[in-house]
UniProtKB/Swiss-Prot annotation:
Matches recorded under Pfam families: Metallophos
One function term, GO molecular function aspect: hydrolase activity
Native source species: Haemophilus influenzae (strain ATCC 51907 / DSM 11121 / KW20 / Rd)
Recorded superkingdom: Bacteria
Database matches in InterPro entries: Calcineurin-like_PHP_ApaH, Metallo-depent_PP-like, P-Estase_HI0762_prd
CDD domains with a match to the protein in the record: MPP_superfamily
Coiled-coil boundaries: none
SUPFAM superfamilies: Metallo-dependent phosphatases
Name of this protein: Uncharacterized protein HI_0762
Length: 226
């Protein structure tokens, strides 16, 4: 059984009732894990097979970044690859578009992280690469890596069209990869799009859960203080 989890933002208690009552669950988190240590993933892993993509909040602090990329859990990040999970080919596009790198449909400022570093002053370089913030920025190279591969499902943090804040480049990627389902997080609502595209799009909202067909198992409203 595959479950898709919307942005947890550091809280995972809502997931346990669903992974404890089922056997052989693969849990796929759609970004914004917002961890301070990797302990929470270690606890979840006792009950399910964990996969994820990163979101914009996963490079907001060094601790959030290191909880993923400084731990063994970085191997479970689906970003920029296709992995067979329980017989389903799942492609991952983590992160968000940012104007300093690329804000489609505008032309990109940089093609990939190496290009960014070549034209950046030394004080902007962090740990030998792009700044912490841009470790979760989408570069054109990320799309290029995926677009010549095939998958059944595309997961992303950013939304495709027709979301008002969605990006056509994600729709184009889904078409090239031949997927039948797209799941995304980032925007905290829960809804399934009705579109002309030959694939189903599901927005899995804040601390919510959906099954592999895009049916909601848990819908949560983000009532945190702004």
């Amino acid at each position: 059984m595959i479950l898709f989890a919307g942005d947890p933002h550091g809280s995972y208690d809502h997931i346990y009732p669903f992974i404890k009552e089922q056997e052989n669950v693969a849990l796929i988190i759609l970004g914004d894990l917002q961890l301070t240590t990797s302990d929470e993933l270690d606890k979840l892993a006792k009950h399910c097979d964990i996969w994820f993509i990163h979101g914009n909040h996963d490079s907001k602090t060094i601790s959030a970044f290191d909880s993923i990329w400084g731990s063994e859990w970085q191997s479970r990040n689906l970003h920029n690859r296709v992995v067979d999970i329980q017989g389903t080919r799942i492609a991952g596009l983590g992160g968000v578009f940012r104007g300093q790198i690329w804000m489609p449909p505008n032309r990109p400022m940089f093609f990939d992280p190496i290009h960014y570093c070549q034209y950046s002053p030394q004080e902007k370089i962090w740990r030998g690469g792009v700044p912490l913030r841009h470790r979760t920025s989408i570069f054109p190279s990320d799309i290029e890596i995926l677009e010549n591969q095939q998958a059944d499902v595309l997961i992303c943090h950013e939304a495709p069209k027709p979301h008002p804040m969605g990006f056509q480049v994600i729709n184009d990627l889904a078409m090239k990869m031949g997927v039948k389902l797209v799941f995304h997080g980032h925007h905290h609502e829960n809804f399934t799009y009705r579109t002309k595209y030959p694939y189903k799009i599901t927005n899995v909202g804040f601390r919510s859960l959906a099954d592999a067909e895009g049916n909601y198992l848990l819908q949560t409203i983000d009532d945190r203080e702004k």
